[in-house]
Regions:
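Extracellular mucin-like PTS domains
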Residues: 1-25
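Preference for extracellular/luminal or secreted protein segments
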Residues: 25-64, 269, 287-357
Length: 357
């Protein structure tokens, strides 16, 4: 009978492991191992700078010291990009890194010089939905060939307001949900992580968040229209929170810094338990009102897991501020550890696989 018990246990374990891989849940004991990480390394696992190909050298230095979770790559890029990304991964002190890029199509595609032109979301919505999924998969396969692990797409904003335009599939939430999920599935088919953006909906906001903090329609309007597509994103999709002021929800505070928006609405009400990423905290909507390190503290407190923090030369300052916030009580260790746990699980990194000095 002992043997039977053992078999049952090991079967259960196997099953658990399988489902773990699919949902990317952390391995048992992960929380303890994360709590044992050196503080600077731990806070680094929630930070992603934005760099061009030339800036990947600086990123390699940060990665070698265990101070970042990955990087967002922007233009200019050239034929040496794949090698540059591989060299960053090779020196990382904390395992596989997130290598992300905005490859939406239309006006926002960083790799068109290498991979060719891709239609905008608005143009895609005129094509058969199955073809869109295939095209998204093919593009993501080409991205994987360069070393990318994440596509900061699809845009599931409803409407073509300032800063969005043809980046949105449609003014109709059902069309956005259908095509947005087709793109997300295509990206997943290629083994990359899709990132739906910009929660809770930038499509009908008053301004471009690169310049200033836009105001959306009132929350009850958002619920009926803009929140619809988010409910249809496939499991494994991450969510990027935009910089938006929502009357009746955040009232003048950016959603990316709002506990009500991220933890209250996205996590609790909508039940999202995947990875939450901030839009770039260096954008005018946020940076206009405070510095990036302060914004990073608020964004983590709000419930965001992975922070895009602008240029790589600012990473040390952000990390320092997060350490200070942990020490003075503005940030709870539990919240930081939870974010790190999600990011490492997303990267397929076992936090117990390291020996810290």
């Amino acid at each position: 009978s002992t043997t039977t018990t053992t078999t049952t246990t090991s079967t259960t374990t196997t099953t658990t492991t399988t489902s773990t891989t699919t949902t990317m849940a952390p391995p048992p004991g992960a929380a303890d191992c994360i709590a044992a990480m050196p503080l600077a390394t731990r806070v680094g696992q929630v930070l992603m700078p934005v760099v061009d190909q030339g800036g990947l050298l600086e990123v390699a230095d940060l990665a070698g010291r265990g101070l970042i979770a990955g990087a967002v790559v922007v233009e200019p890029v050239d034929g040496g990009l794949g090698d540059a990304i591989a060299s960053v991964q090779a020196v990382s002190a904390t395992g596989s890194l997130v290598m992300a890029v905005d490859e939406e199509g239309g006006t926002v595609q960083r790799l068109d010089s290498l991979l060719g032109q891709m239609p905008s979301a608005r143009q895609m919505a005129g094509h058969p939905i199955g073809d869109v999924r295939i095209a998204a998969r093919q593009r993501a396969e080409a991205m994987a060939g360069l070393g990318f692990t994440m596509n900061l797409a699809p845009v599931v904003d409803v409407g073509a307001g300032p800063g969005i335009g043809s980046r949105s599939f449609s003014e109709d939430p059902v069309v956005v949900a259908a095509f947005g999920s087709a793109v997300a599935y295509g990206v997943l088919d290629a083994g990359l992580t899709p990132v739906a953006k910009h929660f809770p909906g930038h499509g009908r906001a008053s301004a471009d968040s690169h310049e200033e903090l836009p105001v959306t329609p009132p929350f009850e309007d958002l619920e009926a229209v803009d929140l619809v597509p988010w409910r249809y994103m496939p499991p494994g999709t991450a969510v990027m929170v935009g910089h938006l002021s929502v009357p009746g929800l955040t009232d003048g505070v950016s959603t990316s810094l709002s506990h009500e928006a991220v933890t209250g609405l996205l996590r609790r009400e909508m039940g999202f338990d995947g990875l939450v990423i901030s839009d770039d905290l260096a954008m005018g909507a946020v940076a206009g009102g405070m510095d990036i390190p302060q914004a990073a503290v608020l964004s983590l407190r709000a419930g965001v897991d992975l922070l895009i923090v602008g240029p790589s030369d600012g990473v040390a300052g952000v990390a320092w501020e997060l350490v200070m916030a942990l020490e003075d009580g503005r940030l709870s260790p539990g919240r930081v550890n939870e974010a790190v746990e999600r990011v490492l699980a997303q990267r397929g990194v076992d936090p117990c696989g390291f020996e810290w000095e």
